[in-house]
Each structure stands twice: as C-alpha cells, then as structure tokens.
Amino acid sequence: MRMKKSLHRRDFLKQTALATASAALPVSPFASFAQTQQGQTPAAGQRAAAVPPHPPTKPRPHFPTADPAWAVTWDAALAVLAGNVRTLPRYDHPVLVEGSTYAGIWQECAPQEGLVYGTLQKYVAPQPGEPTPLQVARANHMAFFAQQKPDGQLPASIKLADKVGTDAGYGQIQMVVPIAATVWDLFLLTHDQELLETAYAACSRWDAWLRQYRDTRKTGLVEGFCTYDTGMDYSPRWKGIPNRCPDADARKCPPDPTMPRLCPDLSATVYGGRIALAAMARALGKYSEESRWLADAEHIRHLILTKLYSPEDAAFYDLDAQNNFVRVRSVVTIRILGEHVLDPIKDKAIFDAVWTKQVHNPEAFWAPFPFPSSALNEPTFVRPIPRNSWGGASQALTALRAPRWMPHYGKRAELTHLMQQWCAAIMRHAEFRQQMDPLTGEFTQPDPGGYSPAALVFLDFARRLSRA
C-alpha cells in the first residue's frame, strides 16, 4: 500500500498507549519456538503486550497454550481495531480504517478487513452508540459503492483527509481481493438483501468499467498502468514505472513503450469478482446473467494460464507491451492462488509445479515467516528492508489473505504453520506493525503500530488455531 498521511496525533497517541509494556510475561515454548530455531531468546521487553482499556466482557477463544501473552495480545488487538473505527467525511457510517500511517480505506484490502472483523463479532463487547463489527463490515463495502462514479469507476481509496466533494481516490484501480467476493461472503453471514442488490449493481458496473478502460490491447486481460494499481509499493516488479497514472486519472496510461502491462493479479481479481457476481446473480434469480458471468470468468482464467504463466519458472508474470515477461518472482503468483485461478483437478500439474518450485520452496517463498513479497532467491530482493516495501518483506496483508486459498488447495497443515509463525512474531512485538523480515520475524520498526491488518491477522489466526 502507498504511504498516506498519518492519523491525527490524538489517535496516534491512543494507539501508542495501547502498545506500552505490561508486566514481563514468561516466554512459552510456542511463543519463542521460531527464535530458538535461530539460537535467539527474545527479551521480555520485546514481547511486551498492550493493556486493554477495559476488562473484556465477551468470551475469548481457547488459545493453543496457557501463555498469558495470547490473552493480552488478543485484547490489545481488539483495542487497536476499536480505535481504528472512524467516520469519513465522504461517508456517514463508521468504517474500519487501515491504521498506522494509512488514514483511510483502500479497495484492495478494506472490504476484506471489514469482513474479517465482522466474523469476530461474538468476541467484541457491544458499546452504547458504537457500531457492531458486522455493521462496520457492511460500511467497509457500502462506502465504495456510495462513491462510485457515474461511469462505473469505484474509488481506489477514501481517506479521512478527503473533503466532501473531492475527486481524490480515482488515480489508480488498486485492487487485490475482489470487493465482489468479500461482499458475497458478508451477505452469506447477514442475508442483507439491500447489500446484495446494491453490490450486484455496483460490481457489475465496475467490471464493465475495467473492460472499457483497462483492456486497451483488446486481449481480454486486465492491464496495469502504474505501480499503485496493484498496491505493491517499491516492488522491483514496477521498477522505472510511475507510481500514479497521469493526471491522477486511472483511465490514462503513462507514455512508456513497455506499457500497458497485462497483469496476472489484476486479472485474477476480475476472475474472482466474476465468480462472486455469478453467485449473486443466482441468489437474485438472474440465471442467464449467472451463466454469462461464469463464462466470462472461465474466459479470463484461460487467458491468465495461457498468456501469463511461465512453465520453466513455475511463476506468473506481467507481460509488457512488447510481449516480454517482467521476470520478477513476486507475490503475484500467490495472488493467483488467492482467487483459485488454478483448478485443483484440471490444473493439478501447474499447481504442483508452482507449489513445489515457488510457494513451498524454502529458498523462494516458504521463508521462516511466510510469505515474502519477493522470493528469497529473487535477485532483486530489496535489502536492507525499508518501510512499506513490497520488494521482499512479509506483509500482514498477504498473511491475512492466506486462509482464502490454502485450505482450498488442501494445505491446512502449512496454513497452521504460517499462522503459528505470525502469532509468535506478533506476541513478541505487540505494536501491530505492517511488515516483517521473512527470515527473522522482526517487524520493520520505522512503521508505526496500530495497523488494522496486523491486529486482524492475530485475532483471525488465534481463533483458527484454537480450533486446530
């Protein structure tokens, strides 16, 4: 994600207070296992957890061990999220903002974050006059639909700094997890008919906008015009390409002979969105439209596999305007799996190659703290790791998305390992920061804490591990 204006100082101080050290906690075998593998024992101060503002009045999961760090970190994560529920000038209902330096919501992640928060509702004590997590989840979708332009474009972001009537937030498409997919999942939880009907109309128009303005080469795939389209700031994938679209207009491609690019992850987002639109159409009794969405989804899926996959590398790459692969092995390949582009049966050979050579390869993406944003053995891996870097750091956003695809491909044991690693790292450093070193699990310190995705990673993973 792109660096944004910091939260108001009062809110930053509130979040900082949540991260102050509590009494030293004993180091459990679970919380320290990742470090003892490297012969290191974390200091008690490094594992200091936040103190919740009020005693919890809702049940907690049955945590994997008796280590009190679980409960303390759990309460601290809930407090971070409560502090990040804000009202935007351009939308009347409170939303869950990104937190840390990101004072707003982004289409690539906010809908999923709202959804995950909604699934935690039974653990969140209701507060008078405050929205429930499911109400926040609804707002994290409806805010984007409310700001949709007449031509169908959805905003990439809506920020606390945006004034009413501003045209900000439309300078890139910045999508990863399809908003259509998360809104469908939310509908399955709430059976909110108004949400379903609004989402179906809005997401259909968004798909049409992308067809019109992001398929200039008429390939049927989705084109990337700038770095921020994919939210992969400072990734070598986009070296030499402008961060923003010209004139902050997502319809305009920069005048570069290698642009626009055919992007596998953006195309996968559209694929996942069309699958969700088909489900919505069926729920609305629009059976002919369901068939059309499924056919369109299969069409773009086929194009991703035939045009953007490199069998020799077992990786997915951008294809530039000169029909050359941009051979940077990035988290793009994992994003393809995130939308289930590979059929577990029909595409088993491709999946097995991708899994073995890239995703589960300890020299590539299966780092001690998965998943790095670039393969460990990728020559362009960026070190030392700067803040907000998709050039190598393991990002909380990528971790939060893992449960969307790993069980689908039968990788539950590996998901459990990933969740254990992330929970252990977060309990050591309970500031809830954006990213960490994939080799050590050390969070990037220049990133301020209070980052909603990191808090959600801990809460969602702790809950899932309690069922294991």
Give residue spans per PLM region.
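C-terminal segment of N-terminal export signals and the immediately downstream linker at the start
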Residues: 6, 27-66
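Aromatic-rich carbohydrate-recognition surfaces in CAZymes
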Residues: 103-232, 264-267, 271, 393-406, ...
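N-terminal secretory signal peptides and thylakoid transit peptides that target proteins
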Residues: 2-20
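Inter-helical turn/loop segments and adjacent helix faces that build the functional surface
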Residues: 186-197, 277-292, 409
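Short amphipathic alpha-helical coiled-coil/interface segments
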Residues: 77, 203, 293-308, 422
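Extended glycan-interaction surfaces of carbohydrate-active proteins
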Residues: 64-105, 139-170, 216-261, 302-394, ...
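Aromatic- and glycine-enriched pocket-lining scaffold segments that form the walls
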Residues: 261-284, 294
